[in-house]
Amino acid sequence: MFLIRLSRHNPSSFTLLTRRLHDQTISSSRLRDLYNFQSPPPLSSSASENPDFNQKNNNKKKPKPQYRPPSSLEGVKTVHSDLPFDFRFSYTESCSNVRPIGLREPKYSPFGPDRLDREWTGVCAPAVNPKVESVDGVEDPKLEEKRRKVREKIQGASLTEAERKFLVELCQRNKTKRQVNLGRDGLTHNMLNDVYNHWKHAEAVRVKCLGVPTLDMKNVIFHLEDKTFGQVVSKHSGTLVLYRGRNYDPKKRPKIPLMLWKPHEPVYPRLIKTTIDGLSIDETKAMRKKGLAVPALTKLAKNGYYGSLVPMVRDAFLVSELVRIDCLGLERKDYKKIGAKLRDLVPCILVTFDKEQVVIWRGKDYKPPKEDDEYSSFIHRESSIDSDVDLSCSRGAQDSPDETT
């Protein structure tokens, strides 16, 4: 700005100033030639030649990459699981003996597309490849033996009575809040992951069972021990204490792929037929009308404990051929499951589900069943799954709801 103003006011002085600046630059270049002055090398070349400088730069923290939202276009790595059993949505409420007659949806895997190396058949993801040439190869006979060996390895030596009481005491409601809730869907596949997460921080976890699965607690205990390789050390009504085992290592827990959604249940044969076997149409109608008029044996509460329902029905069949159970307020699929379980456990014949009632018939040639046999797989103990009177009754009575009659 100063030079511009000077050139406007006095152009002669501006020319003199430029000549002086030019003479100074010439003199400085002459001094450089006279004294052999050399400028220092640039910083970039010294940094590349100095190894200590490069090492310091490498030790610096690398910048964090920018966040990229997940996209369905990116490939997902397929998960492999070595668990020796078929993956189902519910292990306690699904029966592998009854074959479905149809599917309500295409065979989309609930684990997600290409996320699991097992094929989804519409009902389960079998541990062995279902596409085999021979019929004998559909089910691997060594799976049960493999599960038994894995469980024995994890459990180690059996617990003493003092150790069992100590674990039960630690799992009371006044001691810990760790609990796994088991509802109308029973033992689901994702619930296995919840059990293993609790086993990271504690040796045992409390399992609270309510609703339809409590009708057959032996089935619940069997599948809990079979699928988690644990041990049920206490049972008080619908409250169980599941122990992880002496040799359990949380760092070596099995890989459990999670289900992303609940698959639709397949279509099974009808529970109530048009006519009851051995009776005519008129006799069937008369029996259904008579069954709805019979006094109710009990009224089931929603999300209650139904563990004493089977012996109640067996005792009622000693004096009456028809039994009615009031299920008012329960969902239709719930009391249908109750009827299906009673048919297999009592055993009996289903008559009707009308008016939210479960009416069952003992049959023509009824014989009182014998005492229940224990499951032949993993439940070999006599007293470990019984209720602990001193601990569970005093501290766990408030933890289990009473049955509404």
UniProtKB/Swiss-Prot annotation:
PANTHER family in the record: CRS2-ASSOCIATED FACTOR 1, CHLOROPLASTIC, CRS2-ASSOCIATED FACTOR 1, MITOCHONDRIAL
Keyword RNA-binding on entry: yes
Upper classification of the organism: Eukaryota, Viridiplantae, Streptophyta, Embryophyta, Tracheophyta
Quaternary structure and partners: Part of large ribonucleo-protein complexes that include group IIB introns.
GO cellular component: mitochondrion; ribonucleoprotein complex
Coiled coil spans: none
Protein name: CRS2-associated factor 1, mitochondrial
Gene3D superfamilies attached to this UniProt entry: YhbY-like
GO molecular function: RNA binding
Matching PROSITE patterns: CRM
Transit peptide: 1-20
Cystine bridges: none
GO biological process, one term: mitochondrial respiratory chain complex I assembly
Positions of the CRM domain: 157-255, 277-373
Principal localisation: mitochondrion
Function: May be involved in the splicing of group IIB introns in mitochondria.
This protein's record includes keyword Chloroplast: no
Segments for region (Disordered): 32-75, 384-405
Subcellular location: Mitochondrion
UniProt keyword terms in alphabetical order: Mitochondrion, mRNA processing, mRNA splicing, Repeat, Ribonucleoprotein, RNA-binding, Transit peptide
